[in-house]
Every structure is written in C-alpha cells, then in structure tokens.
C-alpha cells in the first residue's frame, strides 16, 4: 500500500469471487436495501480431503504463512465482508487444528491439485481453522476453513442474515434469497450466469489503469 501511494501506481488484489454474476447480483440486491440490516453471517470453504502439495510449499509455514485459513479463507472472508458493506473488524477469536498431517487418503477436491507432494517434507500448518469476527457495527461473521475434515463433500459458501431477508451464496451454484411477501415465506433464485471471475477481475483492472475508473478493491479492505 505504501509503495503504491509513493509511486502513484494502482494496487489491486485478485478477488475473483466478487466478479461472478451471482456475486454482483447479490451486491446490488443488498445495496438496494432488500436485505435490511445485515447483523450476522457465516462463510467457509471446507474440504473432505484436499491438502495441496503435502510436504511442500503449501504445508510449510515458513514459506506459505499458513494453511487453509490463508489459502482458502482469504477469498471467502473478502466476499462476505464486501457483501456486508466492508464494516471494520474490532475483535477476532478462533482456533486451529492439525489432525490430518499423516493421512494419505486420496483427494476428492478438484481445487487441491496445486503443488507437488514432497516425501518426508514439512507439515507444520493447520488443516482446519474456525473463528468469529465482530465488527464495529455490531455484526458478527463465523468462519470455517479446512483442507481435510470428515464431512459429506467440499463446499464453499457465504450465508448472510438481514432483518428483511437472508442469502446463501454457494460457489459456482449461484445465490438464493430467503424472505417473506404478504405474510408468506418466499425464496428467490435468480438465474445468473456465473461467468469467469478471474477474467472479469482482470478486465476491471485494465479499466482502472486505462480509463481511470475507481477500483472495486481498495487496499484498506485487505488490511482490515
């Protein structure tokens, strides 16, 4: 951030989840006021078996900085807080676990095919992290991220609950809204084209550099 400000260059971070079609729809829905006050939520990316590059870069804290919290969590936390309107965190609590370092079960995750397995390598990061963030507006966000845990199947999600409606965002599957109309419970399932979040993010970056539009991502959001 300091280098960007000193040089006058544009700093943006790849936050591709923001650029899916259903993410944009959800953001516009929230900003229209249809969710009301968002006061709590959950987000996670949990795998049954999906440890990337066991023994190598991913599982060596001195190189990667951490396990699924820093690998997977950053993407879902960013999406959740962005949808919530970027409130400022004031307190965080959590716990981490390393229970599958010696588990050699086959991976069932298509998202875990990164890095090469290193025999007799290092595994000193967590394989599961859970926590909660409390924000300056009183809202809370629960977190859960794992490379390996005994669950049914891999899922990545954001759930937000507002005073007027709630939503569930699920990976490439889309977004659903839960509300009521005329005294009846209603579900809204918009048919959005997901698109390629990475491509859309890069197009926005080019637009920022070439046409000087305001960046969707601001460095302070990452710092928070």
PLM regions and their residue ranges:
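Active-site loop of classical SDR/Rossmann-like NAD(P)-dependent oxidoreductases
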Residues: 169, 192-203, 217, 224
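Residue-level signal for the nucleotide or nucleotide-sugar donor/cofactor binding architecture
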Residues: 21, 71, 155, 197-200, ...
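C-terminal helix-rich "cap/oligomerization" subdomain common to oxidoreductases
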Residues: 1, 6, 136, 204-224
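A short, polar/proline- and glycine-enriched secondary-structure boundary/capping micro-motif
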Residues: 152-157, 178-188
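Contiguous beta-strand/loop segments that form the cofactor/metal-binding neighborhood of enzyme cores
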Residues: 78-174, 202-213
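Hydrophobic residues in well-ordered beta-strands that form the structural core
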Residues: 11-13, 42, 143, 169
């Amino acid at each position: 951030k300091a280098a960007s400000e000193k040089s006058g260059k544009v700093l943006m971070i790849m936050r591709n989840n923001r650029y899916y079609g259903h993410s944009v729809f959800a953001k516009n829905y929230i900003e229209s006021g249809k969710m009301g006050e968002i006061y709590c939520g959950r987000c996670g990316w949990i795998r049954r078996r999906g440890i990337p590059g066991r023994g190598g870069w991913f599982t060596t804290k001195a190189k990667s900085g951490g396990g699924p919290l820093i690998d997977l969590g950053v993407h879902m936390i960013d999406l959740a807080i962005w949808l919530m309107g970027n409130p400022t965190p004031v307190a965080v609590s959590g716990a981490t676990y390393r229970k599958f370092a010696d588990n050699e079960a086959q991976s069932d995750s298509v998202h875990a095919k990164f890095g090469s397995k290193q025999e007799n390598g290092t595994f000193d990061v967590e394989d599961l992290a859970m926590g909660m963030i409390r924000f300056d507006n009183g809202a809370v966000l629960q977190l859960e991220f794992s490379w390996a845990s005994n669950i049914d199947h891999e899922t990545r999600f954001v759930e937000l609950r507002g005073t007027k409606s709630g939503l569930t965002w699920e990976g490439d599957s889309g977004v659903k809204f839960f509300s009521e109309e005329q005294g009846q419970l209603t579900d809204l399932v918009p048919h959005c084209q997901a698109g390629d979040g990475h491509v859309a993010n890069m197009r926005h970056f080019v637009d920022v550099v070439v046409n000087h539009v305001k960046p969707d991502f601001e460095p302070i959001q990452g710092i928070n």
